[in-house]
């Protein structure tokens, strides 16, 4: 069967930069799914996109569907003939198949013999299927917001102007979004505005590049990266390439040209983060640092044209950025006229959540939690309390209202200016750490206390009003808050009891609609986040389940047990001991054992049970100090030595002895074995 490349390109006015790549990938996936559903084979599908086009190229596309062998079943043979003559049922079936009764066959099945007909159905030509496939793919695109244009009732993200559909060298006759398919595309709006007729689908990328368009998203992104780095090198600086900004800029240009501009050094008196946010958010500029990591009065802009006069483009950008940076300087100067502490009253008019009060209420709650945590971790409770009082004050400053991503950062700057203790100032920024899984945790005790308190307050409050996350909905980012708490406690090695902290946090809220069982619900939710954490660490979920089966409420202790059980699970003895513990659990459960672990050595009869009893006693003496010191890995190493005695016991000893006293004693021996392992985890869970 012959195979040929397919090209589909939809030309439009400038699309939203954030939507370009998702739309192109969705178009690719929609066409690929349509082809697969139609049983048309192809080798691969690739997505391309620029601000003015979405395109898909399918390689090795078969020219038709495969032929299919069809089998139709008619009436039962007994009903198909009477006295050797075909009945109306047989004749009607033959007519429906377009043949005579003589052309029909007998089909043998488990339910008897039937009249049937077999024939081969030719596959439909791919070009006949493509219009509907492409139309469905386009209609299914996740367009953020549709619009209409002109007198047409057609809707799309932006007005569309051309449609290319080429199967090899041939145009596929089709109409999509009111556009008739052809072979004519467009190049760069300014460098190559004339129409471009494509002779073949394979010509697409080269033809566009010759017309100053890089259609490949990844290639365009890397071209920008290379140019930005090269410009930085020329200026003896380091370019900071934010990947999100790189993606956005890539969605704004078809033919990237990086240029370096400058701004007045007087703006460097403004905190660097403010200037960077302004350049990034307003103008999509990349900033440059000197060898010491200090912001330089330079920026890199990515133009969409190769100008004959690059300096004019640079000067235009410098003219545009000047008032933007002046605004940032104005916000900074205005904010500094008022102390952070004086803004606390303004928090009374900012609602945190309708049922949970204002930001002033939240600040009061986290003050109590922060000071408690600080005292528990050896920090300064007064510093933690002061940090909590000021924690949300920068949210009502001009700078943060303009650039919300600077929350905490500006609080630190303003607190330092106000003469607050350095730990207090630093905590205002640290309260938002970690921002993602691999991010740093706070470095100061006040920062640790504040970061924990803020998240615990949010978790208990939102759960307490019955708005816990469900499915994909998590409007208050509770998953991130829970993971943040776990990360802080584990990475900072804070051995705090999460239940105790949650009880304190819940108490600060007073009456909550869902107060009953609140602490247990939040605790379970948070500890369940360890499941994803273990998977990210490459640890089997059975290890998580083994630890989760125990009533462990200290996340640091939980993590230590996870690592210890993971190491144990790699040992040769682990499989046998996990199986043995599962067997023990089943036996004790079935016999409804009372939990007694007291073994009467006088009732030990078999050598194997005596050996196991002695081994358990020795292990208990060796393991107890290790458990008390939370040295779980070493404890499990000791317990691994029980494999031999345990195997011998189950091989040589009948647990369910006829003598009731002996039977109870053996059950107690098994309960003693189980309880020793349960000091760390339920390793029976490893046997899944």
From Swiss-Prot:
Q: Which InterPro entries match?
A: DALR_anticod-bd, Gly-tRNA-synth_bsu, Gly-tRNA-synth_heterodimer
Q: Where in the cell is it found?
A: Cytoplasm
Per its UniProt record, what SUPFAM superfamilies does this chain match?
Answer: HD-domain/PDEase-like
Q: SMART domains from the entry?
A: DALR_1 (SM00836)
GO cellular component, alphabetical, reads: cytosol
Family the entry assigns: Belongs to the class-II aminoacyl-tRNA synthetase family.
Q: Which NCBIfam families match?
A: glyS
Name by which UniProt lists this protein: Glycine--tRNA ligase beta subunit
- Source organism per entry reads Chromohalobacter salexigens (strain ATCC BAA-138 / DSM 3043 / CIP 106854 / NCIMB 13768 / 1H11)
Q: What is the lineage of its organism?
A: Bacteria, Pseudomonadati, Pseudomonadota, Gammaproteobacteria, Oceanospirillales
Q: Which gene encodes it?
A: glyS
């Amino acid at each position: 069967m012959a195979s040929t490349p397919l090209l589909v390109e939809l030309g439009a006015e400038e699309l939203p930069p954030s939507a370009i790549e998702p739309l192109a990938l969705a178009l690719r996936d929609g066409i690929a799914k349509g082809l697969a559903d139609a049983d048309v084979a192809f080798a691969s599908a690739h997505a391309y996109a620029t601000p003015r086009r979405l395109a898909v190229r399918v390689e090795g596309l078969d020219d038709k569907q495969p032929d299919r062998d069809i089998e139709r079943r008619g009436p039962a043979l007994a009903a198909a003939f009477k006295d050797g003559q075909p009945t109306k049922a047989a004749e009607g079936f033959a007519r429906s198949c377009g043949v005579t009764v003589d052309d029909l066959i007998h089909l043998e099945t488990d339910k008897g013999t039937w009249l049937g007909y077999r024939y081969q159905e030719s596959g439909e030509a791919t070009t006949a299927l493509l219009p509907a496939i492409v139309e469905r793919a386009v209609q299914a695109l996740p367009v953020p917001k549709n619009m209409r244009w002109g007198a047409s009732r057609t809707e799309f993200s932006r007005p569309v102007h051309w449609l290319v559909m080429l199967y090899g060298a041939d145009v596929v006759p089709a109409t999509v979004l009111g556009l008739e398919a052809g072979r004519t595309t467009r190049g760069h709006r300014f460098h190559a505005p004339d129409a471009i007729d494509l002779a073949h689908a394979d010509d697409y990328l080269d033809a566009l590049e010759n017309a100053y368009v890089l259609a490949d998203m990844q290639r365009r992104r890397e071209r920008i990266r290379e140019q930005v780095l090269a410009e930085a090198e020329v200026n003896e600086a380091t370019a900071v390439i934010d990947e999100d900004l790189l993606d956005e800029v890539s969605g704004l240009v078809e033919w990237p040209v990086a240029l370096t501009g400058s701004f007045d050094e007087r703006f460097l008196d403004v905190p660097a983060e403010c200037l960077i946010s302004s350049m990034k958010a307003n103008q999509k500029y990349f900033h440059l640092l000197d060898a010491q990591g200090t912001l330089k009065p330079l920026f890199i802009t990515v133009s969409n044209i190769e100008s004959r006069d690059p300096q004019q483009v640079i000067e235009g950008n410098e003219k545009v950025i000047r008032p933007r940076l002046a605004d940032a300087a104005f916000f900074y100067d205005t904010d500094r006229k008022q102390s952070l502490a004086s803004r606390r009253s303004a928090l009374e008019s900012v609602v945190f959540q309708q049922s949970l009060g204002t930001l002033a209420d939240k600040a009061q709650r986290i003050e109590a939690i922060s000071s408690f945590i600080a005292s528990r971790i050896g920090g300064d409770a007064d510093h933690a309390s002061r940090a909590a009082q000021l924690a949300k004050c920068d949210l009502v400053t001009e700078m943060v209202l303009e650039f919300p991503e600077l929350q905490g950062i500006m609080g630190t700057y303003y607190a330092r200016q106000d003469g607050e203790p350095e730990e207090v100032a630093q905590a205002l920024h640290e309260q938002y750490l970690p921002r993602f899984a691999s991010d740093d945790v706070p470095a100061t005790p006040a920062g640790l206390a504040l970061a924990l308190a803020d998240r615990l307050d949010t978790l208990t409050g939102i759960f307490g009003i019955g708005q816990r996350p469900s499915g994909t909905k998590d409007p208050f980012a509770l998953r991130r808050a829970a993971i943040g708490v776990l990360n802080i406690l584990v990475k900072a090695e804070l051995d705090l009891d999460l239940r105790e902290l949650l009880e304190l946090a819940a108490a600060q809220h007073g009456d909550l609609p869902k107060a009953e069982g609140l602490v247990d619900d939040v605790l379970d939710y948070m500890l369940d986040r360890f499941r994803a954490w273990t998977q990210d660490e490459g640890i089997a979920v059975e290890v998580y389940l083994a630890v989760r089966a125990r009533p462990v409420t200290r996340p640091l202790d939980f993590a230590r047990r996870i690592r210890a059980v993971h190491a144990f699970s790699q040992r040769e003895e682990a499989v046998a001991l996990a199986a043995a513990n599962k067997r023990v659990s089943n036996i004790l459960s079935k016999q409804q054992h009372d939990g007694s672990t007291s073994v009467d050595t006088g009732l030990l009869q078999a050598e194997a049970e005596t050996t196991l009893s002695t081994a358990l006693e020795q292990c208990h003496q060796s393991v107890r100090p290790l458990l008390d010191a939370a040295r779980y890995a070493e404890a499990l190493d000791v317990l691994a030595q029980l494999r031999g005695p345990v195997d011998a016991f189950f091989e040589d000893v009948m647990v369910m002895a006829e003598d009731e006293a002996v039977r109870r004693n053996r059950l107690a021996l098994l309960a003693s074995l189980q309880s020793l392992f349960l000091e760390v985890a339920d390793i029976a869970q490893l046997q899944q």
